[in-house]
Swiss-Prot record:
Heterodimer of GatD and GatE. Its EC number is 6.3.5.-. Residues 74-403 form the Asparaginase/glutaminase domain. This is Glutamyl-tRNA(Gln) amidotransferase subunit D. The keyword Manganese does not apply. GO terms for molecular function: asparaginase activity; ATP binding; glutaminyl-tRNA synthase (glutamine-hydrolyzing) activity. It comes from Methanocaldococcus jannaschii (strain ATCC 43067 / DSM 2661 / JAL-1 / JCM 10045 / NBRC 100440) (Methanococcus jannaschii).
Length: 417
């Protein structure tokens, strides 16, 4: 039984027929059914498998497009990390096209030809839930390489689950005079409702703008009318499946992008490029930093667990204005006494931490806990990793609330919620 075979799988829950697809888990059989949906079946639940028809060997070779460079257009490098923005499924064989070249991108989204000269390659091929700091370092290094080779802008195709973490990491690690745009798709490009093409077009439009910094581009509403440009340290995935899942947190989107008219309307000021194409990276990250959610009845021993594992930093995702139950105070003190930097965010996501309002917050401050202003928890996590990777703990405590790359807005916007 090979990828591309048409199979019939019998389980206690019914019979499933379709094309056998590559699976990322050896314990799961994945098939594409006639209705276009993929189904994963645990092997332990399979009663019988029958091969209905043998599939064809996947054929990936296509003639080159031989596109000439347009000197009037900017050059944008699109780097894939394994997202689905330009992925294609061969329905005859069930195979997923593994390459990610400029030709592949233009075949998938020919509108790109009128926007920029496109370079494209895959730097890794992972599901975004498997992202980790060593991959952030790899992406940063590849961005530097592309800019040094002349790219006017960078687009990172990324899975949506952890895109905000990667956007935060790149915001701190990469200092570049070109725009770096992360883009993803909530619906894969083999589905009629896919948002991949419009998101990618909008991302390339943003990447050719005379701005610098790290941003995320995704659908602005559930239809197909516009996309938003979000600051990389002020964005979060707020819905598991909607196409407009990404929202700016404690801020408003940077810009509204119309992929049809190519119009970009800026909603707030951004840092302009000076056309120098300078790029520097600092990939020093302290990976022993934990993010712990506070909840009623929690066992404070989890804090001691990380301390005893020699973790250097802990981000608490507290309640309300930045609170935690008094019965874990002794464990927090254990951490700070050991020199662990402990900071506080809020699980409300929107709003800011203010530990001076109630006695609980004031007591936490006496224990050495530092409030993180209006940073989302994942941004605070990545920032603490970056700071601990580059500074001594006492300096980290001073810098955690210093705005480094736009992660903090000291004045709360009424229109940001």
């Amino acid at each position: 039984m090979n990828v591309g075979d048409v199979i019939r799988v019998e389980t206690d829950k019914g019979i499933f027929e379709g094309i056998l697809l590559p699976s990322t888990n050896e314990n799961i059989i994945t098939i594409k059914m006639k209705n276009g949906y993929n189904v994963g079946i645990l092997k332990e639940n399979v009663k019988n498998i029958e091969i209905i028809a043998k599939g064809e060997k996947p054929k990936y070779e296509l003639p080159p497009l031989n596109i000439e460079k347009n000197e009037k257009l900017k050059t944008i490098s699109i780097l894939s990390t394994g997202g689905t923005v330009a992925s294609k499924v061969d329905y005859k064989t069930g195979a997923v096209h593994p390459s990610f070249t400029a030709d592949d991108l233009i075949r998938a989204v020919p509108e790109l030809l009128d926007i920029a000269n496109i370079k494209g390659r895959a730097v890794m091929n992972i599901l975004s839930e498997n992202m980790k700091p060593e991959y952030w370092r790899k992406i940063a290094e590849e961005i530097k390489k592309e800019i040094e080779e002349g790219a006017d802008g960078i687009v990172i195709a990324h899975g949506t689950d952890t895109m905000s973490y990667t956007a935060s990491a790149l915001s701190f690690m990469v200092k570049a005079d070109v725009p770096i745009i992360l883009v993803g798709a909530q619906r894969s490009s083999d589905r009629p409702s896919s948002d991949a093409a419009l998101n990618l077009i909008s991302a390339v439009l943003a990447a050719r703008e005379p701005i610098k910094g790290v941003y995320v581009v995704m659908h602005g509403e559930s239809g197909d009318t516009f996309c938003y440009l979000h600051k990389g340290v002020k964005v979060r995935k707020c819905h598991s499946s909607r196409r407009d899942a990404f929202k700016s947190i404690n801020s408003i989107p940077v810009a509204k992008i119309n992929p049809f008219t190519k119009e970009i309307i800026y909603l707030q000021e951004v840092e302009k490029s000076d056309n120098s194409k300078k790029v520097e990276i600092n990939t020093n990250l302290e990976e022993k930093v934990a993010l712990i959610k506070v909840y009623p009845g929690m066992d404070g021993e989890i804090i001691r667990f990380y301390v005893d594992k020699e973790y250097k930093g802990i981000v608490l995702e507290g309640t309300g204005l930045g609170h935690a139950p008094e019965y874990i105070f002794e464990h927090i003190k254990y951490a700070t006494d050991k020199g662990v930097v402990v900071v506080m965010t809020t699980q409300t996501i929107n709003g800011r931490v203010n530990m001076n309002v109630y006695s609980n917050g004031r007591e936490l401050q006496k224990l050495g806990v530092i409030g993180c202003e209006d940073m989302p928890p994942e941004v605070a996590l990545v920032k603490l990793m970056y700071l601990l990777g580059n500074y001594e703990p006492e300096e980290v405590k001073k810098l955690i609330n210093k705005n480094l790359v736009g992660e903090i807005e000291y004045r709360s916007r009424f229109d940001a919620y």
